[in-house]
Amino acid sequence: MPFREPALSLRDILDGIDMIVRFVHGMDLEAFREDPKTVAAVERKLLLISEAAMRLGGDAERLCPGLPWHSIRGIGNWLRHRYDRVDVETVWNTIVDDLPPLRSGVLRALAPPG
């Protein structure tokens, strides 16, 4: 059972992704690595995305099938509990490789039917 209306959590995920995209606009991996404020901001938004995914509960798979929800939820635990071993390149790869399909899936789920 989700904590709240699924559309609200989906919107939180979308907003988090869009903020991350704005944070890293014009950066490459090296620029990202050299900007600890941006790294911290991105990690914070990934935590919020993870939490919103957890709040979706089973609705996540129903609303956005085919996405790696276990991994999306798990990145929050990785950032919280292994904070001293977070690899900036892994965070960057998450931004580049994983956020675009997540964003597309969330947009499809939020689109009006028809």
What are these regions (language model features)?
Residues 1-114:
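Solvent-exposed interaction patches of small proteins and small membrane subunits
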